[in-house]
C-alpha cells in the first residue's frame, strides 16, 4: 500500500497530519515513511513516529524509475507493509511555476499513488469544496 499526503500549500499542517497518520498506522502495521524533496527536518519526526528511517523521494534529482526503485527499496529494507509519503509545499509547486519537476504530483504520478489533500479550512465552508474540486481537475 502507498499513500501520499499533500497540501494545498505550505503551512497547512502536512507534517503534523502525516506524522500522526504514520504513528496511528504504525500501531498495527510496519510503516516506511518518505518525504518528497530534499527536506531533512520533517523526516526526523517520521522516524520517531514509525521507528524506521524516513527516506527522501525527489523528482529534481531522480527519474521516475529511480523514484519507484527508491520507494520499493525503502519498503524492502524495513520489511514494511505500507509506505506513507509526506509531500512538499503545495501539490503542484516545484522548481518551476509551469513544470512538474520537484513537486509532489510528480512523485504521486511516478508511484501511481493515491493522494490525500490537506488544506487549511479555517473560516471556509463551501470554498473548501471549491478548492478541492479545483485541485482534482487541474
Where are the regions that the model predicts?
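ATP-dependent carboxylate-amine ligase catalytic core
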Residues: 2-12, 16, 22-111, 115, ...
Amino acid at each position: 500500500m502507498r499513500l501520499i499526503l499533500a497540501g494545498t500549500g505550505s503551512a497547512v499542517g502536512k507534517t503534523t497530519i502525516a506524522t500522526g497518520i504514520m504513528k496511528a498506522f504504525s500501531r498495527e502495521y510496519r510503516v516506511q515513511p518518505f518525504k518528497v524533496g530534499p527536506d531533512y527536518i520533517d523526516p526526523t519526526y517520521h522516524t520517531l513516529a514509525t521507528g524506521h528511517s524516513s527516506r527522501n523521494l525527489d523528482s529534481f534529482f531522480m527519474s521516475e524509475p529511480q523514484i519507484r526503485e527508491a520507494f520499493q527499496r525503502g519498503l524492502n529494507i524495513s520489511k514494511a507493509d505500507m509506505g506513507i509519503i509526506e509531500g512538499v509545499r503545495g501539490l503542484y509547486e516545484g522548481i518551476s511555476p509551469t513544470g512538474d519537476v520537484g513537486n509532489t504530483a510528480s512523485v504521486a504520478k511516478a508511484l501511481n499513488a493515491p493522494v490525500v489533500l490537506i488544506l487549511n479550512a479555517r473560516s471556509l465552508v463551501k470554498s473548501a469544496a471549491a478548492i478541492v474540486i479545483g485541485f482534482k481537475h487541474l
